[in-house]
Amino acid sequence: MVSLAFNGFGLAATADLHLKVAPDSAFWRAVYAQWEHGAWVGCTFWDLIMPAFTFMVGLAMAYSYVRRQREGHTTAQMFRHACVRALLLIALAVFLTTGTGKETQWIFTNVLAQIGLGYPLLFLCWNRGYRVQALAAAAALGLTWIAFVLHGGSTAPGAGVTAAWSAQHEAHLAAAWHKNANVFHAFDVWFLNLFPRASPFVFNVGGYQTLNFIPNLATMIFGLMAGEW
């Protein structure tokens, strides 16, 4: 988070300057690549920003609801509070995504929306003990894996994906995770088109999907476990 606030401590800008002088430098290319999202397959330092946010949400919940419990709040009251907070986060996410545009952008893939979608489920794991929490995290990841595999993949390029890109990426079982040709993408093609839109939703350029909040819930639970440790 500190790195994000300080724009990567200037490393991205420094790497960019060095690459202008020595564009073939493998070292500075590797440094610069850490400040961009990985191209679907892979992971960079920049890709860890959202998991860091969601981990801290779980960490904060461990303290927040203990305080509320000590103040005499019932479980029902705290769950209602968690649901209201979740709705506010989702509404704020839509507002920020829409910006100054004339049409409301019903997109639920930014970090606030993803936290909001998983927040009530995270609360249900609060104060349940490490075993239940670990099982919940495993279930979130395991059910995601099963859903992707059962849905299957495609050897054809997904929406917004070129044939050349497709040929260089997912194959065999991994094809189930192909960009814009997987079960979460199929859900969004149905779900996001339930909202009023100027044109039908076809794909997300970055491959981000609403149901990403399910595996992301595991990261939030890990934060909760750390906070309760």
What are these regions (language model features)?
Residues 131-218:
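Long hydrophobic alpha-helical segments that form multi-pass transmembrane helix bundles
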Residues 2-4, 121, 142, 223:
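Hydrophobic residues within the alpha-helical transmembrane core of Major Facilitator Superfamily
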Residues 25-34, 90-98, 191-200:
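Active-site-adjacent bridging/hinge elements
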Residues 1-70, 74:
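N-terminal signal-anchor module of multipass membrane proteins
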Residues 50-66, 112-124, 214-229:
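Specific transmembrane alpha-helix
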Residues 11, 67-72, 101-102, 149-160:
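Transmembrane helix-loop junctions in multipass membrane proteins, especially transporters and channels
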Residues 47-52, 67-97, 103, 108-119, ...:
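Transmembrane alpha-helical segments and their boundary/interface "anchor" motifs
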